[in-house]
């Protein structure tokens, strides 16, 4: 428990300090996906709130742990009186006088039997703490998935921007060539104008692609709670994608049931519902407690001889000890209804667990089929790029030899550009889908 508490406090108190060091180094080197995820976990507000809730559950465990100990309370009082009253020190006659009374006391109470309420409250608090920790783990998983999606989106937009820039270079080369041909009368003004329009269109596409990249980088930096995206760069992934055999959905589901935070939290809360029922049932049992006390006082009265303070405290000391038994007989069916409510809550928690398992299985199935489709799409896009590269190469040679028009050349160029863009999209779609499957298998996303 102490280790858990230390971890929660570290997340709450030191996350900002640790992260600020990384933020200062944001411009020094590219960030890996793992670095982005770790940084987001340290700074995300939702995670810090969830960690705070888990820390509160830890306090509740500590409170219930010591609730079986005796309590000890002290009391002190001071009263003054004046007027006609019976004397407590002399003959007991009624006289006009003023008096002062100082009282002191200690009392304690020990619960001997509470109908098993206290041990069940302690067990419930421990299970609630475990569930709260799993809630924290789920919050970390959620931010990891969000960061992964945003990270890959940045890389995707960056590659599209590079493709757009390369298309400008190709268009400018062709414009330069057509200008040369125009000067010697081998190209028409319409062809030159069309080439100029193509350059302008490619430049506009490049500006849009670059803007998309900057916006996605801004989204990621905001997700990481970075003050600015300036100087924030990402590591480039491997050029070649390694395709591994996909684990069957049923096997992934079996693995996920053993560790998935959402499932574990639901299981802990369902287990705790048994304690909640026993806590409600404890009101059916008699309650037995032991109590004791010490009290003394110091009294003075005008016109009378008063013994010393210490003497009176000693002589007036009284002691008491007793046992209190409270037997429930009829409480307007309140206990019965509380037990019914606890059992209904248990049924609701059981349904929630069942729903969580079914939802998990559906998510794994969808992730698996999406990964299969993404792999097929990438393979198809590879073939499309190869075919369009060959077609564009042939069309370039024909255009340079004057055997094709600029329209035909431009169409081949656009087809190649689309094929390259489709391959980039398929590449990052597969990377994301495969990481989702790794996530369900309990592997660290990096």
Model-derived segments and spans:
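Short segments within alpha-helical structural elements
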Residues: 52, 62, 201-226, 385-443
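Sec/SRP-type N-terminal targeting helices
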Residues: 48-52, 65, 98, 112-140, ...
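Bacterial Sec-dependent N-terminal signal peptides
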Residues: 1-33, 445-446
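Small/polar, glycine/serine/threonine/aspartate-rich low-complexity segments that form flexible
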Residues: 24-29, 75-110, 236-245, 278, ...
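Bacterial Sec-pathway N-terminal export signals of envelope proteins
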Residues: 23-73, 77, 83, 228, ...
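Periplasmic alpha-helical coiled-coil/stalk elements that build and connect Gram-negative outer-membrane
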Residues: 142-255, 370, 374, 416
């Amino acid at each position: 428990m102490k280790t858990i508490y230390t971890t929660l406090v570290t997340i709450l108190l030191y996350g900002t300090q640790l992260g600020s060091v990384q933020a200062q180094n944001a411009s020094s080197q590219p960030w890996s996906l793992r670095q982005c995820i770790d940084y987001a976990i340290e700074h995300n507000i939702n995670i810090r709130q969830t960690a705070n809730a888990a820390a509160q559950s830890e306090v509740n465990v500590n409170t219930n742990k010591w609730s079986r100990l005796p309590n000890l309370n002290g009391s002190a009082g001071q009263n003054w009186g004046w007027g006609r009253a019976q004397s407590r020190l002399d003959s007991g006659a009624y006289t006009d006088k003023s008096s002062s009374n100082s009282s002191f006391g200690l009392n304690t109470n020990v619960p001997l039997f509470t109908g098993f309420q206290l041990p069940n409250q302690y067990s419930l608090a421990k299970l609630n703490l475990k569930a709260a920790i799993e809630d924290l783990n789920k919050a970390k998983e959620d931010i990891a998935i969000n960061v992964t999606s945003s990270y890959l989106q940045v890389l995707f937009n960056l590659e599209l921007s590079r493709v757009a820039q390369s298309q400008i270079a190709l268009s400018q080369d062709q414009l330069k060539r057509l200008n040369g041909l125009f000067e010697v009368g081998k190209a028409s003004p319409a062809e030159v104008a069309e080439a100029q329009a193509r350059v302008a269109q490619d430049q506009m596409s490049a500006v849009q692609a670059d803007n998309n990249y900057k916006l996605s980088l801004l989204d990621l930096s905001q997700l990481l709670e970075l003050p600015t995206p300036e100087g924030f760069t990402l590591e480039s992934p491997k050029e070649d994608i390694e395709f591994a055999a996909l684990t069957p959905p049923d096997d992934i589901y079996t693995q996920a049931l053993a560790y998935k935070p959402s499932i574990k939290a639901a299981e802990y809360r369902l287990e705790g519902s048994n304690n909640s029922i026993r806590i409600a049932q404890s009101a059916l049992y008699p309650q037995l407690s032991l109590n004791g006390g010490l009290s003394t006082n110091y009294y003075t009265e005008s016109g009378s001889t008063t013994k010393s303070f210490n003497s009176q405290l000693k002589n007036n000391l009284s002691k008491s000890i007793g046992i209190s038994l409270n037997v429930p007989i009829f409480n307007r069916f309140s206990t019965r209804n509380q037990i019914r409510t606890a059992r209904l809550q248990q049924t609701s928690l059981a349904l929630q667990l069942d729903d969580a398992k079914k939802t998990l299985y559906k998510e794994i199935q969808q992730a698996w089929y999406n990964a299969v489709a993404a792999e097929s799409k990438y393979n198809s896009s590879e073939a499309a790029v190869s075919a369009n590269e060959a077609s564009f190469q042939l069309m370039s040679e024909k255009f340079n030899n004057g055997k094709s028009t600029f329209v035909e050349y431009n169409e081949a160029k656009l087809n190649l550009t689309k094929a390259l863009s489709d391959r980039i999209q398929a590449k990052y779609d597969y990377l994301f889908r495969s990481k989702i499957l790794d996530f369900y298998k309990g592997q660290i996303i990096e």
